[in-house]
């Protein structure tokens, strides 16, 4: 047994300079684990609650001292004495102590910090890498990355409606090669943007955020950048987009409005046709949140229309919650889930969401948040679960590159047993 003897929480900063929670867990035999909790900008309304202080005199109200107090007080009192390898027991005890459906009493940021740090302490105690501790000897699949090289929507200050334009090196043979291909394309894109007089400053997730005339212009630049880097679009590198359509949805008149660019408005059938046209015109392999998070029947309709051609990822739609995922599976809504550990608030629930998705033939994409840190847990998590896809930003900003660097280390550690699926990570669509 490896008994937890001490839990320490503190307030630190994320990649946007906003406060977040860091937790350290100590065991009686010298095991140690540290985790830092990420934070989102575009959040689903059904996400677990991130506890903020609301004190405008500190960090504009975004302080997390209350969450830290909950770590050092009630959560520490509850969890000290647990065997650190009892992840399910630890997480269940914290959920019970909180007593709310959305972890709003103690804060998902407090609970998640303890959950992740406990897992790291257990791995440290056993002398195992985190991915091996969580996934066992079968953890061997390196993920195909979604690299967010152009930012829009809530992640930038430009006039682009879609939140993310991503490249996916589906033709790579290893994660190291995939990262190289992504880096080369990122640099080619920077050169093209600069040559056209567009700014090359980056957004929250490390991608470029210049102004464009419409939502197709970024796609055109991606094609040019892929080719400039020496690759074939749709063969070596495919494109993924995050529409974040809940940001575009007007619930009063039931339309989607391209509010940041052209001002066009679409009914739901028109918006589906609009997206279908983009899929036909560009090598788009994945669309995240193409439909508003509360429109379940419309999600089922777009899945019936496009689900065999393209990966349809539920982010705000599922919020890493197995209750929502179960409903989606039953309705035939979406064919993939985005897994963000802080959307649900514990490691156990994140693992359950991935397992449920895979059992139903859905893909699972393990994801960062726009407010990130140097914590690399999601890199280990995606390998531990053989999920096959990861979304962790662009080829700039250390908070993003930390995850890519960790994936390359893991691939090196796995040696000949490492497997990079590339295009085959999209196992439920016609390729």
UniProtKB/Swiss-Prot annotation:
Its cofactor is Mg(2+). Mg(2+) binds at residues 242, 288, 315. The active site is at residues 205, 340. CDD domains: enolase. Its EC number is 4.2.1.11. The keyword NADP does not apply. It comes from the Bacteria. Binds a second Mg(2+) ion via substrate during catalysis. One of its GO terms (biological process) is glycolytic process. GO terms for cellular component: cell surface; extracellular region; phosphopyruvate hydratase complex. One of its GO terms (molecular function) is magnesium ion binding. It is found in: Cytoplasm; Secreted; Cell surface. InterPro entries: Enolase, Enolase-like_C_sf, Enolase-like_N, Enolase_C, Enolase_CS, Enolase_N. (2R)-2-phosphoglycerate binds at residues 163, 340, 369-370, 391. Pathway: Carbohydrate degradation; glycolysis; pyruvate from D-glyceraldehyde 3-phosphate: step 4/5. It is an enzyme of class 4 (lyase). NCBIfam families: eno (TIGR01060). Catalyzes the reversible conversion of 2-phosphoglycerate (2-PG) into phosphoenolpyruvate (PEP). It is essential for the degradation of carbohydrates via glycolysis. This is Enolase.
């Amino acid at each position: 047994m490896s008994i937890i003897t001490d839990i320490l929480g503190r307030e630190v900063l994320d990649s946007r300079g906003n406060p977040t929670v860091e937790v350290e867990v100590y065991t009686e035999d010298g095991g140690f684990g540290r985790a830092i909790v990420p934070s989102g900008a575009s959040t689903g309304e059904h996400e677990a609650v991130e506890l903020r202080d609301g004190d405008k005199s500190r960090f504009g109200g975004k302080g997390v001292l209350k969450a830290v107090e909950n770590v050092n007080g009630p959560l520490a009192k509850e969890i000290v004495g647990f065997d650190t390898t009892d992840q399910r027991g630890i997480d269940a005890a914290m959920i019970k102590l909180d007593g709310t459906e959305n972890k709003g009493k103690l804060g998902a940021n407090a609970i998640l910090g303890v959950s992740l740090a406990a897992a790291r302490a257990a791995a440290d105690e056993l002398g195992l890498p985190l991915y091996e501790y969580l996934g066992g000897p079968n953890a061997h699949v390196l993920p195909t990355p979604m690299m967010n090289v152009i930012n829009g929507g809530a992640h930038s200050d430009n006039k682009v409606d879609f939140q993310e334009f991503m490249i996916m090196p589906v033709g790579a043979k290893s994660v190291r090669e995939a990262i190289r291909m992504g880096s080369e394309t990122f640099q080619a894109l920077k050169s093209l943007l600069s040559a056209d007089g567009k700014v090359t400053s980056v957004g929250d997730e490390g991608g470029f955020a210049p102004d464009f005339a419409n939502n197709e212009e970024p796609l055109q630049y991606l094609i040019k950048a892929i080719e400039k880097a020496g690759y074939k679009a749709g063969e070596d590198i495919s494109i993924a987009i995050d529409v974040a359509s809940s940001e575009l949805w007007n619930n009063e008149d039931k339309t989607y409005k391209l509010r940041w660019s052209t001002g066009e408005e679409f009914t739901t059938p028109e918006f589906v046709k609009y997206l279908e046209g983009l899929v036909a015109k560009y090598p788009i392999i994945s669309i995240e949140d193409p439909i508003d998070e509360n429109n379940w029947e419309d999600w089922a309709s777009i899945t019936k229309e496009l689900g065999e051609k393209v990966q349809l990822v539920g982010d705000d739609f599922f919020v890493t919650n197995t209750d929502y995922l179960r409903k989606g599976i039953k309705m035939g809504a979406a064919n993939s889930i985005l897994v963000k550990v802080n959307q649900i608030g514990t490691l156990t629930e994140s693992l359950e969401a991935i397992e449920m998705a895979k059992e139903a033939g859905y893909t699972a994409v393990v994801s960062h948040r726009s407010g990130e840190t140097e914590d690399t847990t999601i890199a280990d998590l995606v390998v531990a679960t053989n999920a096959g896809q990861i979304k962790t930003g662009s080829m700039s900003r250390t908070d993003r590159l930390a995850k890519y660097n960790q994936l390359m280390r893991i691939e090196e550690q796995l040696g000949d047993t490492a497997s990079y699926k590339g295009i085959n990570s999209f196992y439920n669509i016609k390729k």
